[in-house]
Amino acid sequence: MWLINHTYKLLSYFLRKASNRFFNSSSSSFSCSFLVFLFVVFFSDCFFSITSFLISFGILSSFLIFSLFCLGFLTVIGCLASALSLSSLSKAKIGFSSSLSSISPEGSLKSEEMLEDDEDKEFSSLLYGTSYVFAISFK
């Protein structure tokens, strides 16, 4: 359950970044790499659903090698696509946060650099936690 929660937090982080770039850019050009990332996330989500269904009925024994290969392939493609989308989104220099997170503890408004640092710290902690869980589960 913890892994699913972190996965959805990562996905919402990417969606928030992409929607900011899409709605705030003057040319309204959407990142192709982010579309690839969404495609990979959708199919990997379908893959996890099918795999968990097969595990629950004990059919996975003959399907195990193929599923691990597909999982590794989708993970590599997802990481590459997310890295590309993050690099293109970071070039846009668009900060986004809710009104509560844009106020510092002293009561003054945070600068855009501070907001981007907060979002980057949140993303790196989510990514580290998720990769740690994957490393433990495959040991």
From Swiss-Prot:
Keyword set, alphabetical order: Membrane, Transmembrane, Transmembrane helix
Transmembrane residue ranges: 35-55, 57-77
Membrane topology designation: Multi-pass membrane protein
GO cellular component: membrane
Organism superkingdom: Eukaryota
Organism annotation: Saccharomyces cerevisiae (strain ATCC 204508 / S288c)
Principal subcellular localization: membrane
Location relative to the cell: Membrane
Miscellaneous section: Partially overlaps IST1.
Keyword Transmembrane helix in record: yes
Identification of the protein by name: Putative uncharacterized protein YNL266W
